[in-house]
Regions:
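Secondary-structure boundary/capping signal
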Residues: 12-13, 78-79, 99
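A structural signal for well-ordered alpha-helical scaffolds and beta->alpha junctions
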Residues: 1-2, 22-26, 37, 64, ...
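C-terminal capping/extension of enzyme domains
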Residues: 4, 51-68, 93-151
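Generic structural signal for beta-strand residues in well-ordered domains
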Residues: 31-33, 73, 111
Length: 151
């Protein structure tokens, strides 16, 4: 995820990484997210990985996140985005999506008493078979459409 944001905002995928420590610059990431009015949260509070790997295909969602409760705390939120197949399934059910958007696309939904855009983004995982530049372009379009790059 942070390589994507580094590429979008700084034209450098390593901006938010500290290669010497093999970690991320947490305070810089928090500052960037706050500055651009971006909130992040998992689609599920509890999951079970059935094969012990990161694949969505064998991921059981034990407890989905209470999206309605989260959105009640963010009155200015205009969009919800998923970053993978399983999260898209979980969130689309909660949002009452009539149809799932294609990867990199969005649909407008009315959920929890408000209109929202629901984006189905490509997985940010390096294991997802899409070039980083293409992922960044999809995320850039989403951030532009939601106004997050205009702040």
């Amino acid at each position: 995820m942070w390589r994507i944001f580094g590429l979008i905002l700084h034209e450098n995928p390593l901006t938010y990484l500290d290669p010497s420590l093999k970690t991320f610059h947490l305070e810089a990431i928090r500052s960037m997210l706050t500055r651009h009015h971006i909130a992040l949260y998992d689609a599920a509070c509890s999951v079970r990985r059935l094969d012990g790997n990161a694949s969505d295909a064998r991921l059981e969602v034990v407890e989905p996140t209470d999206l309605e409760s989260l959105l009640q705390q963010m009155s200015e939120c205009v969009a919800v985005a998923s970053t993978g197949g399983r999260s898209a399934e979980v969130l689309s059910r909660q949002l009452g999506c009539a149809r799932m958007p294609g990867v990199g696309a969005s649909v407008e939904v009315t959920a929890f008493g408000r209109r929202l855009l629901f984006f189905r983004m490509p997985s940010s995982s390096r294991a997802y078979p899409m070039k980083l530049e293409r992922k960044a372009e999809a995320y850039r379009r989403m951030l532009m459409e939601t106004g997050c790059l205009n702040v």
